[in-house]
Amino acid sequence: MSTKRKTAWFAACAAILCVGVPARAHHSFAAEYDKDKPLKFSGTVTKFDLTNPHSWIYIDVMQPDGTVVNWAFETASPSNLFRRGFRKDTIKPGTVVVIEGFGAKDGTHTGNGQRLTMPDGTKYILGTEENPG
């Protein structure tokens, strides 16, 4: 194979990788969540994962029948949360919070977290509040 052909082949492969990987690596709000399923729960934090690409807050929510359901809320990336005043120790297991967001399309106990209210009334924006979709 000639040098020109090798160069063209390499460039084509690199272009496919550069275009294909980012498109597949990230999802959209509309693919997983339903903007017509708003959620607002008061619950107890059981876990907080400050991870990339998105952080997660898990809360136990008491149901009307007395059972407890653990909900998982996807939030912004750590860097976005930090810019909004959030810190690693902002919430800890046992903290009672109010969380608002949108439910998963598949009906699981998963949501896209938009706003968090702490016991002292402090509010944090967790997602893209103005345009969730």
Positions of PLM-derived features:
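Short N-terminal segments immediately surrounding and downstream of signal-peptide cleavage
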Residues: H26-S42
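Short, structured beta-strand/loop micro-motifs enriched in basic residues and often containing a Trp
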Residues: T75-R83
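Sec/Tat signal peptide C-region and signal peptidase I cleavage site
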Residues: V21-A25
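Short aromatic-glycine-enriched beta-strand elements
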Residues: T51-V61
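Conserved hydrophobic positions within beta-strands
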Residues: G43-V45, V96
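Bacterial N-terminal signal peptides
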Residues: F10-G20
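OB-fold/S1-family single-stranded nucleic acid-binding modules
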Residues: A104-T128
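Short nucleic-acid-contacting surface segments enriched for D/E, G, S/T with interspersed K/R
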Residues: F82-I99
